[in-house]
From Swiss-Prot:
It is an enzyme of class 2 (transferase). This is Trans-aconitate 2-methyltransferase. It comes from the Bacteria. It holds the Pfam family Methyltransf_25. It is found in: Cytoplasm. GO terms for biological process: methylation. Its EC number is 2.1.1.144. One of its GO terms (molecular function) is trans-aconitate 2-methyltransferase activity. SUPFAM superfamilies: S-adenosyl-L-methionine-dependent methyltransferases. The gene is tam.
Length: 253
């Protein structure tokens, strides 16, 4: 996974949290003793879990010390844990594993997702949301913006395209008593092309910037923004629509 910048990520905190709210709304769990926010980031999604289950033990897990620093400041009552998300396991079964916008960074879903289901108590819930934007212009341009950096961009540790929703259904259905999947495209309203670049600098663009020398960033970002400007033209009020598709799944063990 790339190195994270909590302040860059939080520039669009409300917009990033919207999908977490929509995912949480479909979690069929009235009472919970222990809930885990896996890939909690700076705690914006964790706050939703605290609000819904104020008496529960809430645990936030992330690989980034920078993200956890912000999370601890915002929610000191939560248990925070720095861990490799690929190897994390609870000491005992939990009621909810909530993974909002993190699993797309982790490999081998065929092994990882059934294993997460096994960490739930009977009746527990695994709730996952993943951006599905590998083929969107914003992400295609990250890989294809022409320049002297092309060879290094090809080796960036970026996300891979997600399998189809049907693949996830076939993977999880044998292990779940109830399974719901859906996809939504959020038509996010952005002020201009620069705002779209600022959005992706907090997430998907980070591996590509890390693959380049710092003195190459301005030229690459300028070329990338020119591509974004063409791919997302102004609407009638001058602002841009930034379609952002996401895949959701809620599995009950």
């Amino acid at each position: 996974m790339p190195t994270w910048d909590d302040q860059q990520y939080l520039k669009f905190a409300d917009e990033r949290t919207r999908a977490a709210r929509d995912l949480l709304a479909r979690v069929p769990l009235d009472d919970a003793a222990t809930v885990v926010d896996l890939g909690c980031g700076p705690g914006n999604s964790t706050a939703l879990l605290v609000e819904r289950w104020p008496q529960a033990r809430v645990v936030g897990v992330d690989s980034s010390a920078e993200m956890l620093r912000s999370a601890r400041q915002a929610l000191p009552q939560v248990e925070w844990m720095q861990a490799d998300l690929r190897a994390w396991a609870p000491a005992a079964p939990v009621d909810l594993i909530f993974a909002n916008a993190v699993m797309q960074w982790l490999p081998d879903h065929a092994t990882l997702l059934p294993e997460l289901l096994r960490h739930l108590r009977p009746g527990g819930v695994l709730a996952i949301q993943m951006p599905r934007n590998y083929d969107e212009p914003s992400h295609r341009l990250m890989r294809e913006t022409p320049g002297p950096w092309a060879a290094r961009l090809a080796g960036a540790r970026a996300i891979a395209p997600l399998p189809a929703a049907a693949w996830y259904y076939d993977l999880l259905a044998p292990h779940a008593r109830q399974l719901e999947l859906w996809q939504t495209t959020y038509e996010q309203v952005m002020d201009d092309a620069g705002a779209i670049v600022e959005w992706v600098r907090g997430t998907g663009l980070r591996p590509y910037l890390e693959a380049l020398a710092e003195d190459e960033h301005p030229a690459y970002l300028a070329a990338y923004e020119a591509g974004i400007d063409a791919a997302y033209p102004p609407r009638s009020d001058g602002r841009r629509l930034f379609p952002f598709p996401r895949l959701f799944m809620v599995a009950v063990r």
